[in-house]
Amino acid sequence: MLGEVLRERNYIVTPLDIHAGQYDDSVTPVIYNGQKIPFADKSFDTGILLTILHHTNNQEEIISEAARVCRQLIIMEDIYSTQLQKYYTFFLDSFVNMFYSPCPHTNRPDKDWKNLFFKLNLNLEAVYYKKLLGVKQVVYVLKGEK
């Protein structure tokens, strides 16, 4: 849906996925091997990673590779600050994604995401917080190397 909204506003959208399945007839993602995104450095103005990182075991590599091909990153994830929030987030995510592949639930607290961005030498330009169904969500806006 986000891609459709962006295309209606004349943005060029290039979906990327590790699976060849189409989301609908208007979207055909570029398939990649989960390691090397098949585009040159800084090929895109903005990359959006929308609630996908907690479904992976190699977040650092994915973010690094996305930062390589994009001048700016927008990352949205579910975060937690207590054990109760952590397990509630895992439960809700498992329910919402029950028909998809198993999820390793590699969600992080806000502080851990920020530490990872610092480690990857990314500039944190803005942060937005919201709650949805009791789950804390965050959007990070990042620019390439400091």
Across the structure, where does each feature detected by a protein language model lie?
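Class I SAM-dependent methyltransferase SAM/SAH-binding core
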Residues: M1-K36
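C-terminal alpha-helical "lid/dimerization" subdomain adjacent to the S-adenosyl-L-methionine
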Residues: L2-E4, L16, M76-V139
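Short conserved loop adjoining the S-adenosyl-L-methionine
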Residues: K36-D41, N57
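Local beta-strand N-terminus motif with an aromatic residue
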Residues: F44-D45
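A conserved beta-strand element that flanks and buttresses the S-adenosyl-L-methionine
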Residues: I48
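A short His-aromatic
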Residues: T51-H55
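A short glycine-rich, Lys/Arg-flanked "PGG" loop and its adjoining helix->strand segment in the class I
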Residues: E60-I75
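C-terminal lobe and adjacent flexible extensions of AdoMet/dcAdoMet transferase-like proteins
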Residues: Y140-K146
